[in-house]
Regions:
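Hydrophobic transmembrane alpha-helix bundles
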Residues: 1, 68-72, 101-109
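N-terminal helical capping/dimerization or prosegment-like subdomains
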Residues: 2-94
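Active-site metal-coordination/substrate-binding segment of hydrolases
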Residues: 81-129
């Protein structure tokens, strides 16, 4: 059986883009001034982790939040595991932006992402059903 991945993505484009935009809109800058027992890197990274795991769970993956330091999700059964390591926190956006650095923009039919947001986009692609 051959799968036309482009056609499958095109069928789901609007929903996929909304999921991606939801993750990209989260300001997940590390904020050591707000670190506590429930927010080891500040509230932003925890919010991004919770959102990411919620997407994975919604799509049928078994998820686990490890004390807000990390999370994982799995699908299927077996003795072998494929691990993909990534992070959802970002460097501070700084100043000088023409637009909100946490609001994705489509320009000329293309999704424009700032460099630090590409990290989140890569994690999101892993969870696509």
């Amino acid at each position: 059986m051959t799968i036309d991945f482009r056609a499958e993505v095109d069928k789901r484009k609007d929903a996929l883009m909304e999921d991606l935009f939801g993750l990209l809109r989260i300001n997940s800058e590390r904020d050591d001034s707000k670190v506590d027992d429930k927010h080891p890197f500040g509230p932003g990274p925890v919010k991004a982790l919770e959102h990411f795991l919620a997407l994975a769970e919604r799509d049928g993956y078994k998820t686990r939040n490890i004390d807000n330091y990390a999370g994982d999700f799995e699908f299927g059964q077996g003795d072998e595991v494929l691990g993909i390591f990534a992070h959802l926190d970002v460097v501070p956006a700084g100043s000088g932006w023409d637009t909100d650095p946490y609001e994705p923009v489509i320009k000329d039919g293309k999704l424009m992402l700032v460099g630090h947001q590409m990290i989140k986009a890569q994690q999101w692609l892993v969870t696509m059903p």
